[in-house]
């Protein structure tokens, strides 16, 4: 699979404002008569993120959707044979009556189910000899013998270390957040690393491209009992804008949370902008298709299709979309008590950022202009008043707008 070239997409920031001019001649800490701390709004409790499971009770899962996609006994037998030879210490040839097409399907299904088996050379996955009545295949490895054993041991130790650092008691949604954040904090996009296309590159080297991120994410989730699959596809519009071929491949994931499937693109979540960490976190199929093209299932692929999928769930729920779940939504500029409560809580925690969504029922540009002209000042005035005995917000505070996702971020500067 050809790598997807990752470019930081901080360009989603479309505007910024400094509130200093609005504060001219005003003290930010003397509004106690108007905003008495005793009247401060409180944050409403969020709905449950799902049933919490103790870390020690979490069991590894392998959903086996690749195997399940194989519709005949012959294909399933070929899948098992591939598994047998994938787990040998050295490359060995084996003979089968299967066609090249069937072999590609079975191998793709096996790879989809086993992202932890990182040693297949993805630049040349297999070689074969055509005998006319049968084929002799050999899977090509990145490592063999003692090197392979050592690499497996290193990988397993690292994976154990990662999963042991997961929250001691957490829902599947919280485990998903952990896996997303682990990769963002410990892996960087790198097109030069020889292991960039697999989970080893992401977890051991800390350097990978999209399929390395995706496979590592699947490995972490599956190891912690969260169903996760890889999705192959393209991002042609993004590729064209960045000088790439429109058919350059991309890979991301789907996860199953509380019975519903969601798309998540950890590679695109890894960037410079603060809010980008959760930009593509638990999206519907309709939403992800705005800039991702999902490759066809094997049965539907054309000869010209380089990539295919063995399983693509339909994702229709936005219950666990990170931004809709974690960010307060502004529905009316003059009915802002819920927003103020969240803003105040962020300041009391000492957070660097405060994020919220603008309702799709509001005109985004008009709303953010009103925030720049007046409401941003009003909210900071209110938070400083409500928090009179604690941290105070400085006039150098800025806000950033992300119109494509209807979000706003306050980059909070505190008075020393």
Language model regions located:
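A short, highly charged nucleic-acid-interacting micro-segment common to nuclease
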Residues: 99, 199-213
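Secondary-structure boundary elements
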Residues: 147-202
């Amino acid at each position: 699979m050809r790598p997807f070239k990752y470019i930081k997409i901080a360009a989603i920031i479309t505007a910024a404002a400094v509130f200093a001019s609005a504060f001219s001649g005003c003290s930010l800490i003397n509004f106690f008569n108007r905003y008495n701390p005793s009247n401060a709004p409180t944050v409403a409790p969020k709905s449950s993120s799902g049933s919490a499971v103790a870390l020690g009770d979490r069991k590894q899962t392998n959903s086996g959707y690749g195997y399940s996609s194989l519709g005949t006994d012959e294909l399933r037998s070929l899948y098992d044979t591939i598994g047998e030879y994938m787990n040998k210490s050295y490359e060995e040839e084996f003979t089968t009556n299967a066609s090249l097409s069937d072999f590609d399907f079975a191998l793709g299904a096996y790879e989809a189910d086993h992202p932890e088996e990182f040693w297949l050379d993805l630049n040349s996955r297999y070689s074969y000899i055509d005998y006319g009545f049968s084929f002799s295949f050999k899977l090509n490895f990145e490592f063999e013998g003692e090197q392979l054993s050592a690499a497996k041991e290193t990988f397993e130790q690292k994976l154990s270390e990662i999963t042991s650092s997961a929250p001691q008691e957490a829902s599947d949604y919280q485990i998903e957040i952990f896996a997303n954040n682990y990769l963002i904090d410990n892996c960087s996009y790198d097109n030069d690393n020889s292991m960039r296309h697999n989970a080893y590159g992401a977890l051991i080297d800390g350097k990978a491209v999209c399929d390395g991120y995706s496979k590592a994410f699947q490995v972490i989730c599956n190891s912690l009992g969260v169903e996760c699959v890889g999705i192959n596809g393209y991002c042609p519009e993004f590729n064209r804008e960045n000088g790439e071929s429109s058919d350059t491949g991309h890979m991301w994931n789907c996860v199953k949370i509380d019975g519903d499937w969601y798309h998540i693109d950890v590679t695109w979540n890894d960037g410079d902008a603060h809010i980008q960490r959760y930009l593509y976190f638990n999206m519907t199929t309709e939403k992800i298709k705005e800039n991702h093209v999902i490759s066809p299932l094997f049965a539907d692929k054309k000869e010209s299709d380089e990539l295919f999928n063995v399983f693509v769930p339909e994702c229709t729920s936005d219950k666990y979309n990170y931004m809709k779940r974690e960010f307060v939504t502004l529905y009316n500029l003059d009915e802002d008590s819920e927003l103020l409560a969240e803003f105040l809580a962020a300041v009391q925690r000492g957070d660097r950022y405060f994020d919220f969504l603008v309702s799709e029922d509001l005109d985004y540009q008009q709303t953010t202009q009103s925030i720049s002209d007046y409401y941003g000042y009003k909210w900071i005035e209110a938070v400083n008043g409500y928090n009179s005995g604690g941290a105070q917000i400085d006039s150098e505070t800025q806000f950033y707008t992300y119109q494509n996702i209807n979000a706003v971020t306050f980059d909070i500067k505190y008075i020393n």
